[in-house]
Curated annotation (Swiss-Prot):
Transmembrane segment boundaries: none
Catalytic activity: tRNA(Pro) + L-proline + ATP = L-prolyl-tRNA(Pro) + AMP + diphosphate
Entry's family note: Belongs to the class-II aminoacyl-tRNA synthetase family. ProS type 3 subfamily.
Assembly: Homodimer.
GO aspect biological process, one term: prolyl-tRNA aminoacylation
Protein name stated in the entry: Proline--tRNA ligase
Keywords of the record: Aminoacyl-tRNA synthetase, ATP-binding, Cytoplasm, Ligase, Nucleotide-binding, Protein biosynthesis
Organism: Salinibacter ruber (strain DSM 13855 / M31)
Protein's job: Catalyzes the attachment of proline to tRNA(Pro) in a two-step reaction: proline is first activated by ATP to form Pro-AMP and then transferred to the acceptor end of tRNA(Pro).
Keyword ATP-binding listed: yes
Domain of life: Bacteria
Localization (cell): Cytoplasm
Length: 490
């Protein structure tokens, strides 16, 4: 069995690393700051990817793929964009290696590129250069496209899934004839992310817009969803950007409208990444290891055959195989435990560590009584149930687990969110871990001072701010148009 999991209240950071390791999700790679996603982690990402991909297609989007390498000059054409990403960019300067006099491999001086290439940190620049060729008329609009890719943003303090130099993600890039259409698209895709987080990840999120200092480089407005982790910190789980005409102007992307007038195109971009796996872990997992919502778990059910001699093996395995067929006929993802050399307790613990939502165990006594032992991962509850009607019972139980995980996370968020009126109360909430709704005077100076003194940042400005009362900034006493959400964050 894998190593023990450090309790959350003892060392939350180590607990997270233990859950990732014991859950067989990922490990650090020889390339500093990068991760190796293991089969269990990749299967989880594939389930997330496939569901999101279908949701994108249901809203009219198609997939394409752009190169990993971006000409350096493209990054320079949108000033805010290059400033925001410059410190994170990996740069390709040579096309081959050679051996020096001592036999060591070095970049071949003769292979220096005439132009450097940026390893993709995000694709707005190369995509909008291409869109300027694809778009000529209003008849070419809208363009609703997405790509699944890897990106590189050089990270000095890596943490598996949460911050790595290379990660997997999707990035949508759309082009529109009007500002209204583009804003509606950005809001629509934020709603898609919200639905995915709530209904599939069982992770409650809050919607809003970012402050100017937190806005995506080159965007007019950035919309976001924020989730609360078990330590009370926030995780930015997805962003959708209204880019205005900034990239269209930078890359001279215009179209002829219905009145035969030339206009710049309006744009959006939006994305989520393997960072969502980190959010999933920190929302649901416990001191026994990984906990996964059934809708996304690589295997929703594991069947554990229990027998103690050759005479018992045949009947037990036949029953387990029939059970597997019945469950799979109901669309349930099932794994058969074939590890017959370890003890039942070891095998049970291994599946707990990997987060399988439901465990079914069948032994000789269960055959006699036509029963199955069923154990839930989320509550650790066990019960003996009849094999008759087992597929329907398992399906209902998986639905209940999905709902229960969301309810538990929703309750945690509510219990650790406070409305605060003064700075002392604010510091207390932030200090113990939680979300704080507080008044802010709208200045970047106050925002920066609060972050410096408490490490808390403004996670979002709510869309429904008109429902929030006006007041005074908790720190400066200056007028505030409404409350914003503060928290420490990953």
């Amino acid at each position: 069995m894998a190593d023990a999991v450090t309790p959350r209240d003892e060392d939350y950071s180590q607990w997270y690393q233990d859950v990732v390791r014991n859950g067989q999700l990922a490990e650090n790679s020889p390339a500093r700051g990068c991760m190796i996603i293991k089969p269990n982690g990749m299967a989880l990402w594939e389930n997330m990817r496939d569901q999101l991909d279908q949701m994108f297609k249901d809203t009219g989007h198609q997939n394409y793929y752009f190169p990993l390498f971006i000409p350096e000059r493209y990054m320079e054409r949108e000033a805010e964009h290059v400033e925001g990403f410059a410190k994170e960019c990996a740069v390709v300067t040579h096309s081959r290696l050679t051996q020096d006099e001592e036999g060591d491999l070095v970049p071949d001086p003769e292979s220096e590129l005439g132009e450097n290439y940026i390893v993709r940190p995000t694709s707005e620049t190369i995509i909008w250069d291409t869109y300027s060729k694809w778009i000529q008329s209003y008849r070419d609009l809208p363009l609703l496209y997405n790509q699944w890719a890897n990106v590189v943003r050089w990270e000095m303090r890596p943490r598996l899934f949460l911050r790595t130099a290379e990660f997997l993600w999707q990035e949508g890039h759309t082009a529109h004839a009007t500002e209204t259409e583009a804003v509606e698209e950005a809001e629509r895709m934020l709603d898609v992310y919200t639905t995915f987080a709530e209904e599939y990840m069982a992770m409650p999120v809050l919607q809003g817009r970012k402050t100017e200092s937190e806005r995506f480089p080159g965007a007019v407005d950035t919309y976001c969803i924020e989730a609360m982790m078990q330590d009370g910190k926030a995780l930015q789980a997805g962003t959708s950007h209204f880019l205005g005409q900034n990239f269209a102007k930078a890359f001279d992307c215009t179209f002829t409208n219905e009145d035969n007038e030339e206009e710049y195109v309006w744009a959006t971009s939006w994305g989520v990444s393997t960072r969502l796996i980190g959010g999933l872990i920190m929302t649901h997992s416990d001191d026994q290891g990984l906990v996964l919502p059934p809708k996304l778990a690589p295997h929703q059910v594991v069947i554990v055959p229990l027998f103690f001699d050759d005479d018992q093996e045949g009947p037990v395995m036949e029953t387990c195989e029939r059970l597997q067929e019945r469950l799979e006929d109901h669309g349930i993802r099932v794994k058969m435990d074939q590890n017959h050399t370890q003890s039942p307790g070891w095998r049970f613990s291994e599946h707990e560590l990997r987060g399988v939502p439901l465990r079914l165990a069948i032994g000789p006594r269960d055959l006699e009584n036509d029963n199955v032992e069923m154990a839930r991962r989320d509550t650790q509850e066990k019960e003996v149930v009849p094999q008759d009607g087992i597929a329907e019972r398992v399906s209902d139980t998986l639905d209940d687990i999905q709902h229960a995980l969301h309810e538990r996370a929703q309750d945690r968020q509510a219990d650790n969110t406070r409305v605060v009126e003064d700075y002392d109360a604010f510091r207390e909430v932030i200090g113990r871990g939680g979300f704080a709704w507080a008044h802010w005077d709208g200045t970047p100076e106050t925002e920066a001072r609060i972050q410096e003194e408490t490490s808390a940042t403004i996670r979002l400005i709510p869309f429904d701010r008109e429902d929030h009362e006006e007041g005074e900034d908790m720190l400066t006493g200056e007028p505030s148009e409404g409350r914003v959400l503060f928290a420490q964050a990953y």
